């Protein structure tokens, strides 16, 4: 039995998230498993580094699978991409030993959230960015983003239905910056709670709209109550861009993305 790690890029527009759902509900995981199973001529189960909500995208979702099938790495990639829908693509594949696990060996995960801040919605970026037409106080949002760095109890910033056993997470960085008409939130942590990034972005957007001051974030943390924070930002602008592992696994590091923004690494 051989274990493979794979890097996957996908648009989440047509899917109910990464994880396999009930029959008849499209998911990224199930779509890829179906294709890999045909290539391997045996059932394949993918284990992803994380889960994404419906409508959320990824530029480098890492997953692994085990198989008895013998194929060159190029054969797996070419075979899968020729059969996958155009909104899912295998970017790389690598043979691994059994010690590797896409989820449990990950040391950190990283997301970017993209806002298009302009008077009119962008037709060509439909469901690839979140459109905000109001003028935002960007400098205030930039300062507020740093409030989320460090180790905190993120109870206020997770979904009410989040199933994680405990809400404490360490955020290595949480940076917001301008890129033309785009605002980009770049956040890396040892792990994320359900809706955590979208709830943080929702908070920053409300601060940018003048609904409350930066220091109010402290009160939100202290409340440890989802009702103490504001909106959950839409899934459209959210991208899973990287998963980090110990150097011993020597996985590829493709450009972070989203590629059409041409952002610095």
From Swiss-Prot:
It catalyses: uridine(38/39/40) in tRNA = pseudouridine(38/39/40) in tRNA. Formation of pseudouridine at positions 38, 39 and 40 in the anticodon stem and loop of transfer RNAs. It comes from the Bacteria. This is tRNA pseudouridine synthase A. Its EC number is 5.4.99.12. It comes from Acinetobacter baumannii (strain ATCC 17978 / DSM 105126 / CIP 53.77 / LMG 1025 / NCDC KC755 / 5377). Substrate binds at residue 111. Keywords: Isomerase, tRNA processing. The active site is at 53 (nucleophile). Pfam families: PseudoU_synth_1. Belongs to the tRNA pseudouridine synthase TruA family. Homodimer. GO terms for biological process: tRNA pseudouridine synthesis. CDD domains: PseudoU_synth_EcTruA (cd02570). InterPro entries: PsdUridine_synth_cat_dom_sf (IPR020103), PsdUridine_synth_TruA (IPR001406), PsdUridine_synth_TruA_a/b_dom (IPR020097), PsdUridine_synth_TruA_C (IPR020095), TruA/RsuA/RluB/E/F_N (IPR020094). SUPFAM superfamilies: Pseudouridine synthase (SSF55120). GO terms for molecular function: RNA binding; tRNA pseudouridine(38-40) synthase activity.
């Amino acid at each position: 039995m051989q274990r493979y790690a794979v890097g996957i890029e996908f648009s989440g527009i047509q899917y109910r998230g990464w994880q396999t759902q009930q029959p008849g509900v499209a998911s990224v995981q199930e779509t890829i498993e179906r294709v890999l199973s045909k290539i391997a001529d045996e059932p394949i189960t993918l284990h992803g580094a994380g889960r994404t909500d419906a409508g959320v995208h990824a530029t480098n979702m890492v997953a692994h699978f085990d198989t008895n099938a013998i194929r060159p790495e190029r054969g797996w990639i070419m075979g899968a991409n020729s059969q996958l829908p155009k909104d899912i693509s295998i970017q790389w594949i690598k043979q691994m030993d059994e010690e590797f696990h896409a989820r449990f060996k990950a040391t950190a995960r990283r997301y970017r959230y993209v806002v298009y801040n302009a008077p009119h919605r962008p037709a060509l970026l439909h469901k690839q960015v979140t459109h905000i037409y109001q003028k935002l106080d960007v400098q205030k949002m930039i300062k507020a983003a740093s409030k989320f760095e460090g180790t905190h109890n993120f109870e206020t910033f997770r979904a009410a239905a989040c199933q994680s056993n405990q809400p404490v997470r360490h955020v290595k960085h949480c940076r917001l910056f301008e890129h033309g008409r785009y605002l980009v939130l770049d956040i890396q942590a040892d792990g994320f709670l359900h809706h955590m990034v979208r709830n943080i972005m929702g908070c920053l957007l409300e601060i940018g709209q003048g609904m409350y001051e930066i220091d109010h974030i402290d009160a939100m943390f202290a409340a440890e109550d989802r009702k103490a924070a504001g909106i959950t930002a839409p899934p459209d602008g959210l991208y899973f861009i990287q998963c980090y592992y110990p150097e011993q696994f020597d996985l590829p590091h493709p450009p972070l993305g989203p590629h059409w923004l041409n952002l610095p690494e």
